[in-house]
């Protein structure tokens, strides 16, 4: 939600290389050994031509081998991943994104030449985003009214808040978004955050 995928796409575009977004749900399997096989097929495909291979939520397959209940399968997956990263052809790039950097295997960290940290947008960025997101929508408030209270939110969360505020006004059959609509949208986002944190803590 902080622009990692967009940054990877721009990187590929600047280099004039094809951009391949790897969907993890197509890699991960409950069958023994199949996840490692799917990873191998992905890297074999990427070796056919110089490209930018992008993994989102990389921690799902690169988690520390000290974690998890099925240590043997986890080791198999991470070991396979380490081998294939080492075999990336010159001219090709691997970019991996995660929100759970503390869970990545230490050996995985050593395979990457560069690490880029993406922070949440600051107040100026929030102000700019709200202004652009709501420019074609009638509002009963100014973006400045909510800038400080939204400084800790990601771009993805800001997008959800704006869309939720629009939805509230539409369901109420009003053409403009009120201050209350936007506050309610922020409260909804806060509750969603809390639920996601609980789910993450229970895993």
Predicted segments with their positions:
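C-terminal alpha-helical "lid" subdomain
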Residues: 123-203
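Walker A/P-loop NTP-binding motif of AAA+ ATPase domains
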Residues: 1-144
